[in-house]
Amino acid sequence: MNLLLDEIARATARLADAGAASPRADAEELAAAVHRVRRSELHGVPDSAFDARFWEFVARREAGEPLQHITGRAFFRYLELKVGPGVFVPRPETEVMVGWALETLRDMDVRDPLVVDLGTGSAAIALSIALEAPRARVHAVEKDPTAFVHATRNIEELDERGRVRLHLDDFAAALPELDGTVDLVVSNPPYIPMSEWEYVPPDVRDHDPADALWGGGDDGLDAIRVVERTARRLLRPGGYAAVEHSDLQGNGVYWIFAEEHGWRDVRNRRDLANRDRFVTARLAAD
């Protein structure tokens, strides 16, 4: 065992004692970030190249700082995104919704589909769609100035073809010039009710921006209600919406769409763990 792998083993034990959910993966990712290699390349780092900053990173993770804030990067589908304090860290669960969105775009008989991402955060969803559906034109909306800076940086670095346009605006008022023309609206809005505050992991509630977590209203679904109204305004007849929610809110979000006139094919869809994760709906064509 080389020095770095030995130190990773020690760090894993420390992070496990601190209550980290995935201590080995965290230790490896911290080591990879410090040494600027992939996790699969850690075994090749020579003893002479060991960087003692690794232990500074481990101490920060022990104290509850999010892994992605320490490393400054988050992985989402095929992207490596720049993240940090003030922007929501994208989660793997959201990747399933993006996969559905891409399949839906492929099935549309539209040459250059128009997509809107409401509450883009780091621009993970917007960039994934733009890069994996190269003909898509994507408008990403973010109201928080700090998150907007992160999104701008990621778009400038990754969107070489200029398919994503970023807008600093609120969900409700966004993009009136596109009313009735959009093919697909996607959103991972805030949806946690404040009554769940004590159950949210500290490294989430103390570090992710509040506006990206707490959805408003007793059920946490007020932001999703705004997304539904905005999607109904933006979409063309026959266009689709996809909105993420927690695994306990599927029924509530289903009825937000099903009870409104104009929506068809409302469905709750599951993530890779077979839990309710996002609702999709089609705006009626008549």
Predicted regions and their residues:
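Non-catalytic accessory regions of SAM-dependent methyltransferases
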Residues: 1-42
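Residue-level signal for inorganic ion chemistry
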Residues: 30, 64, 94, 125, ...
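Conserved Class I SAM-dependent methyltransferase catalytic core
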Residues: 217-282
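Conserved SAM/SAH cofactor-binding pocket of Class I
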Residues: 96-199, 226, 258
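Conserved AdoMet
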Residues: 29-104
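Conserved beta-strand segments of alpha/beta enzyme cores
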Residues: 80, 137, 163-165, 264-267
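Flexible, glycine-/basic-rich loop-and-beta segments that form/coincide
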Residues: 285-286
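Mobile active-site "lid"/loop adjacent to the S-adenosyl-L-methionine
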Residues: 191-223
